Amino acid sequence: MAKKDLRHPRPALNPALILSELAQGSSNWRDIQVVGQVTSTNDIAIARLLDSPNVEVFAVTADEQINGRGRLQREWTSPYGAGIALSIAIPAALFSCSASAIPLVVGVAVNTCLLRQTANAKLKWPNDLMIIKKSGELAKAGGILVQRQQDHVIVGIGINTHLGLQELPTQFATSLALEGIELSREVLIAQIIAELEMTVKHAPEVWREKYLDMSCTLGNQVQVTNLKQETLTGLAKSVSTTGALILETAQGFVEVIAGDVARVRT
């Protein structure tokens, strides 16, 4: 049974339960470190790789993350017991996709797990985990950050599982619990690890087809701001096997490798 930290009303993660869930499946990825409070689980993973660069796959998860980062160095924190802060270090050679497609491949794996709990789980290009709220609006429930460290890829996954309304970082965010999705953090962590182990092996056309079905970006008029702060407007038509968003603009088709997407209201 998970112990409660007297300073916090929510239970701590139970490492034995995570390992038990992994053992019930066919996953070979069972090296997982569970910690209390961290600045960032990615930082813990990087430190281990610096000490042991030849290590195979391992994961780090924490009850509380106080200085996590999302894409473009945006802050991503996780209050004690209220979310999933998970980093998985994977040898880059295990991925069947190009490096630029890794965030999308990870998104497919995570969203596959969320779809077992709710039909309202979606992916927003390039790396946001979205939920269709009871109101019909889309809200962000999580995100993915991918970092390269030597011969490994560190996959950082953050999900708001049990945040209350007052704990949400913005009005455009939500948590699974607020949308009526109750689940065990331990079970979801184990499912994500096991699903990702399979998904990294998918051929590009396989994960891409799944991504197209899960996307809430495609088919909409969007405005994309790329890393050079240039703005493009067009119809989000598809994604390529390299992870690029394919836009149909007034000037023709354009592939965007990275950027921020906002839906254009009509």
Where in this protein do the model-derived segments appear?
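N-terminal lobe of the biotin/lipoate ligase/transferase fold
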Residues: 1-116, 135-136
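Short loop/edge segments at beta-strand edges and connector loops
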Residues: 36, 123-125
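Long, positively charged amphipathic alpha-helical accessory segments at protein N-termini or as interdomain linkers
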Residues: 2-11, 17, 94-96, 100-121, ...
